[in-house]
Design a protein with these regions (language model features):
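Active-site rim elements
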Residues: 21, 69-84, 106-108, 134-144
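Alpha-helical transition-metal enzyme core signature, strongest for iron centers
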Residues: 36-43, 87, 121, 126
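C-terminal helix/juxtamembrane-tail motif
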Residues: 156-176
Length: 176
């Protein structure tokens, strides 16, 4: 078996090995998979294109490959505007879904899942890493301030001892 995509690797590991992040039933696995898909979508279509702008990555091949060539029409300012709007739409959709379906503190209730960890990573990246100051400026300092349910999930994940040990100050220390 050869897997070269980090998301496929995570799903494989969670499926193959029993552990604290393993879904407890097929229904829970489907729900977690749905949240995982949201995170993957957010990462691919918001975070990665923002990263291209932050780093000045101007190679159209990679931007076109991801179907997110935000710099193709209108340049950096238009790219930032479009990505900020996309961020807001995606976050609002997840927030509305969580308000209707989540009993908290995690995405599926009382158990942390691999989707919770990925959501935490996406949110903390925008809130704390150096390069995403561009998004913070446009969003009034915190891109997720209008989304309390999302922040509730991330705060719960951030309180997990293993997450604290692993993440530490890595987000704040990251230059981009």
């Amino acid at each position: 078996l050869e897997l070269n995509d980090s998301m496929a690797i995570v799903q494989y590991l969670v499926t193959k090995y029993e552990g604290p992040l393993t879904p407890k039933s097929p229904d829970q696995a489907a729900i977690i998979g749905n949240y995982w898909a949201w995170c993957q979508d957010y990462y691919s279509f918001v975070l990665s294109p923002f990263h291209d702008i932050i780093t000045g990555h101007n190679e159209p091949f990679w931007r076109n490959l991801r179907l997110t060539d935000t710099l193709a029409e209108g340049g950096k300012e238009t790219g930032i505007k479009n990505l900020t709007e996309l961020h807001s739409k995606r976050a609002k959709r997840l927030e509305q879904h969580l308000k209707k379906s989540s009993s908290g503190p995690f995405l599926t209730g009382g158990d942390c899942s691999y989707a919770d960890i990925f959501l935490y990573t996406c949110v903390r990246t925008t809130q704390k890493t150096g390069g995403f100051g561009i998004l913070r400026e446009v969003c009034g300092n915190d891109p997720f301030q209008a989304y309390p349910k999302i922040l509730e999930v991330c705060d719960a994940v951030g309180k997990i001892e293993k997450v604290k040990e692993t993440a530490g100050s890595k987000f704040s220390d990251c230059p981009i």
